[in-house]
């Protein structure tokens, strides 16, 4: 094979059912970028600014959206994000029910202080200094995020592993050549992803999780409702996705008022 024909191949492994040590080695070393399976498909996972820069380059994506922070435990979530007791109760309910949930929240100052001092803040928050804090996103990636935080206090930042604006259809082959070539490691688990929505096909399955905004237009945390009707601003479901029916039912148990505005990002 001539040198011009040689192509660097990203290492691909099948999920081993536990913490994928190859992923830990790459991410702990810094500047790494991997592709990992979740309940709804595949994500790009990084831990620092260098990794985030690689992600934006691989996805060819605009930088105005709040970053996604993967929380491997409720303790990590509570340490990082500002929440009212009602919001915390919502997370706890979904944690206990093993339901994927992401909410737009402000950072605690003490949480922000733990970010790497490398300028990553500008790439994983929006201009309001909010991020989407996600729990119960699927065992293959949960295990990595939990271990990163508990062993090294490293963050797990995420973005869907597909060309921006396109879905990966829950298949590792759907992540696209650009992302595949850019990643240091691809963890394949098409069987796991398919098992989460066994009654769906490629055309009817959800390719994303539900996202709920818990902040006002300036990024300030919404007020508690305390069973009062009509408190504004209120939670807004801004993206439908996996288990939307269960999540809205749970929200109705905690909040007397919330809005459903799919696509109402900014």
Describe the role of every protein-language-model region:
Residues 2-266:
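Active-site-adjacent structural elements in enzyme catalytic cores
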